[in-house]
């Protein structure tokens, strides 16, 4: 069984604060409406969360590019490579259970940071995950693969 730890968590701030600003947080709580307190909470659209592995930033840094964590729009940043997981795989993080819904393959905005960045991390951009059991995640929580599809 693959396991690791949560290195950092991010949330997109709501309109009343700094709309669209990505903020590093120590914990997040989720329910059926999404990440409590985020801009997209209760917006009636399906918003999967983005999980990014340290592997993505390692690839970027090996190419001598250096960016702050959070650039890849991750909600959850972990130390374990989970990019082998397919749609339908199940991951436990903190109190929560997630289903992998697919690979995150949106690279368009990354061209603004470095033209080579999208090609560099192709296939290693992140995973879309959807909560199926709700609760809380904190930095340092364990990440465990429960089932591989």
Where are the language model's segments positioned?
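Electropositive, beta-rich accessory/interaction domains or terminal extensions
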Residues: 1-103, 148
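Short, surface-exposed beta-strand-loop junctions and turns on beta-sheet-rich folds
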Residues: 106-107
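Short, basic/aromatic beta-hairpin or loop at an interaction surface
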Residues: 63-75, 111-126
